[in-house]
Amino acid sequence: MPSTNRAGSLKDPEIAELFFKEDPEKLFTDLREIGHGSFGAVYFARDVRTNEVVAIKKMSYSGKQSTEKWQDIIKEVKFLQRIKHPNSIEYKGCYLREHTAWLVMEYCLGSASDLLEVHKKPLQEVEIAAITHGALQGLAYLHSHTMIHRDIKAGNILLTEPGQVKLADFGSASMASPANSFVGTPYWMAPEVILAMDEGQYDGKVDVWSLGITCIELAERKPPLFNMNAMSALYHIAQNESPTLQSNEWSDYFRNFVDSCLQKIPQDRPTSEELLKHMFVLRERPETVLIDLIQRTKDAVRELDNLQYRKMKKLLFQEAHNGPAVEAQEEEEEQDHGGGRTGTVNSVGSNQSIPSMSISASSQSSSVNSLPDASDDKSELDMMEGDHTVMSNSSVIHLKPEEENYQEEGDPRTRASAPQSPPQVSRHKSHYRNREHFATIRTASLVTRQMQEHEQDSELREQMSGYKRMRRQHQKQLMTLENKLKAEMDEHRLRLDKDLETQRNNFAAEMEKLIKKHQASMEKEAKVMANEEKKFQQHIQAQQKKELNSFLESQKREYKLRKEQLKEELNENQSTPKKEKQEWLSKQKENIQHFQAEEEANLLRRQRQYLELECRRFKRRMLLGRHNLEQDLVREELNKRQTQKDLEHAMLLRQHESMQELEFRHLNTIQKMRCELIRLQHQTELTNQLEYNKRRERELRRKHVMEVRQQPKSLKSKELQIKKQFQDTCKIQTRQYKALRNHLLETTPKSEHKAVLKRLKEEQTRKLAILAEQYDHSINEMLSTQALRLDEAQEAECQVLKMQLQQELELLNAYQSKIKMQAEAQHDRELRELEQRVSLRRALLEQKIEEEMLALQNERTERIRSLLERQAREIEAFDSESMRLGFSNMVLSNLSPEAFSHSYPGASSWSHNPTGGSGPHWGHPMGGTPQAWGHPMQGGPQPWGHPSGPMQGVPRGSSIGVRNSPQALRRTASGGRTEQGMSRSTSVTSQISNGSHMSYT
């Protein structure tokens, strides 16, 4: 365990600054116990520095649950430091000494429950309204700062000398709202606090409920169900209707106020701010109503203490003169005065207060008022002496000197016996005089009885404390499990998010790599095409040069041949003059040379036109090939994106299934834990109830045994009474016998005296025998009657107790059944809510997937459309330039058949079919040109899937050869077989709508 959590550890600076470092025993003197509870005790004390009267609440944090006690002390100190309001107790500081915290607060006269204890009757409605108004103002302050008191009752509402109402005992308070802890005092608990762990959280309205119960307490001297076992009261409050005021003497305003506070459903219950506007507290009332009540209470306390004082003086006086004697009369008198207090709200109920550090119902004597300080040293010494007397006698007697004089003057017997009183009486007088600054509305007998009850009811208090501790532990276990599962869920969610992010990053890297690869492919293809075009031009130029050389050689041969023929013709014709022959021959030579020059020029022109045409046609084929490559790359990229998106969606669905499985497993774990905790709680409740039943039966048996033990004494007394009556009867008969004997002896002759005496003796013996028989009969009848009456009374008490305990057990069973049903309903509701959340999340995920698929489809369509439009613009621009240069589109659309019959040296195979593309694009067969993808060319060859004409049989990737012959050029130029291409002005939109968009594979 960390040192900062160890009880009493001040290593944490935040905790250390909560406590003062001084020794409290040197700062505070004249300590006198004025209250006692489960936490410890409250003392009256005086601050030696300021001579100010204070109240000190001592809380030990040693022994069992020391860490829990220490945490409660820290929480209460922090709470007291935060609150500053006229209707809340003023905090002065906290000190530590020997594993005990000294919580110093302002001193108050007493609590509202002390008023009930002293007066033995309910308060007046106007007094209840004044007390309630002050308490409401304090609660409104707490609730406005999101704090909850959680232990409102008459014992925790204190009064000061000026009549101010103060809220005290914040050991159960919560600094956060809403809360869900099981704390408070059973009879004042709101239903939602009792069901806190089962049904969820609660807020400041629990204090409003407790205030309503407190109003009933002040109006009826005890809260509802106070005659019931505290545990049974919890079950009763949780499932039965709200209590109401029983008497009809209260006003409608008061009844409505109580009914509003005790609304079973918290949402229907008003807040403390709203209750401050209620007519019950706003009605006009005397300003001095509480001051007058306090004064009357102080007078009554003085009278009660004076009565006890006179008894003690009388007892001491008789002991001094007569020795020990049985004061039966005084015992009866004491019973008359003290017996009526047992029905009030005493510390038994308060000691059942749930928080271990809370002040009990009648021990709240720590509050505001600072009384006049002592003026002389003698008074201080007297007070120290008085303190010693009080602590040794475990009692508190409150009497001022003038009060003592007043009571002595009013009691002649006391005044007459005062000079003869022993030293003890003098010490008691000195003791009373020393308390002149100790004002209170609590009687000495109340403090003494409270201490005794605290010692006697330890078993019941320990049972309630154990139950409270169990509820706390269960709540802590549940919160620990929920936090653990939440951490597991967060970790799982982070892991899934990380996996998804990793996959997306991998996909992005793959896509970037693919795009770079495509860019490299395009660059490489551009270089290859440039080289191919250069080689193609060089090949044609080489062939044309070769053809030109051949042509020139043939012209030379033809020239020589023609020259020889002409010479032969001239030689045959001898009649022609030689000069004429020479001229004719020269002219023929010139004609031949001119014709050959024209033929050469025509050849060069045709070669140039052919070169330009074939280069232009080659460039168009290159452009179409690049377009096909772009289409293939775009198709590959889009298919890759589609594949990645499918994989991402599959992962999202798997993650959804994984999250769903984990959520259902967590919910099942929490519900199992909750069921187990409810089972343990119900088992503990049943065990506690059975122990309570056994204890009640044991107490009743003990009482009956005591009655049986006391019966011989009462029987002996009655037997002595009967015996006395018999003796009186015997004496009467003896006197009558003597009188009759004397009379008969006087009236009868002396000779008959013997017979008369004998007869009288027999008669007397017979009557005495009859009287003895009657005596025995009376004794036996009395014994049997008394025994029967005792048996019947005890049997009746046993039956009543059994019925009561059976009802409480049935109430517990009903409560537990209700809790189980509520838990099952809650589990079903949680399961339905989780299923709804999962279904909604699945629907949102599917909607997101559908939207992403639609967006991807739109992106694919847009990419294809933009690519087709760009390629169409490029082809159209190329064809326009060709038309400007004088080339026909039909001529450029297809190579001549002869062009495929030869290949130039060094020509490489194209990676794409320049005439028909690379097969089906976007899921449809392509035509010979990309003008209209997926449609046959009008007037031209069939699509690649149905080749025809001279193009049939050309393999993919075959080299393109061009037959360099004027005949081919002439045939092409003269309108030989050509293929009509489709115009590039065909609408791209119609192409896409007709099926040229992607077909996802």
UniProtKB/Swiss-Prot annotation:
Organism: Rattus norvegicus
PANTHER family attached to this UniProt entry: SERINE/THREONINE-PROTEIN KINASE TAO1-LIKE PROTEIN, SERINE_THREONINE-PROTEIN KINASE TAO1
Modified residues (Phosphothreonine): T669
Residues recorded as bearing Phosphoserine in the entry: S9, S421, S445, S965
Regions of compositional bias (Low complexity) in chain numbering: 350-370
Family stated for the protein in its record: Belongs to the protein kinase superfamily. STE Ser/Thr protein kinase family. STE20 subfamily.
Regulation: Serine/threonine-protein kinase activity is inhibited by SPRED1.
Gene behind this protein: Taok1
Span of domain Protein kinase: 28-281
PROSITE patterns: PROTEIN_KINASE_ATP, PROTEIN_KINASE_DOM, PROTEIN_KINASE_ST
Lineage per the UniProt record: Eukaryota, Metazoa, Chordata, Craniata, Vertebrata
Protein name: Serine/threonine-protein kinase TAO1
Modification(s) after translation: Proteolytically processed by caspase-3 (CASP3). Autophosphorylated. Phosphorylated by ATM in response to DNA damage. Phosphorylated by LRRK2.
Gene Ontology biological process: central nervous system neuron development; DNA damage response; DNA repair; execution phase of apoptosis; microtubule cytoskeleton organization; mitotic G2 DNA damage checkpoint signaling; negative regulation of microtubule depolymerization; neuron cellular homeostasis
Binding site for ATP: I34, G35, H36, G37, S38, F39, G40, A41, V42, K57
Catalytically driven reaction(s): L-seryl-[protein] + ATP = O-phospho-L-seryl-[protein] + ADP + H(+); L-threonyl-[protein] + ATP = O-phospho-L-threonyl-[protein] + ADP + H(+)
Consequence when changing K57A: Loss of serine/threonine-protein kinase without affecting interaction with SPRED1
EC id: 2.7.11.1
Subunit structure: Self-associates. Interacts with MAP2K3. Interacts with SPRED1. Interacts with TESK1; the interaction inhibits TAOK1 kinase activity. Interacts with MAP3K7.
Leading EC class: transferase
Biased composition (Basic and acidic residues): 577-587
Function of the protein: Serine/threonine-protein kinase involved in various processes such as p38/MAPK14 stress-activated MAPK cascade, DNA damage response and regulation of cytoskeleton stability. Phosphorylates MAP2K3, MAP2K6 and MARK2. Acts as an activator of the p38/MAPK14 stress-activated MAPK cascade by mediating phosphorylation and subsequent activation of the upstream MAP2K3 and MAP2K6 kinases. Involved in G-protein coupled receptor signaling to p38/MAPK14.
Region Disordered, annotated ranges: 324-380, 404-431, 567-587, 905-1001
GO molecular function: alpha-tubulin binding; ATP binding; beta-tubulin binding; kinase activity; myosin V binding; protein kinase activator activity; protein kinase activity; protein kinase binding
Residue ranges of coiled coil: 458-651, 754-877
Localization (cell): Cytoplasm
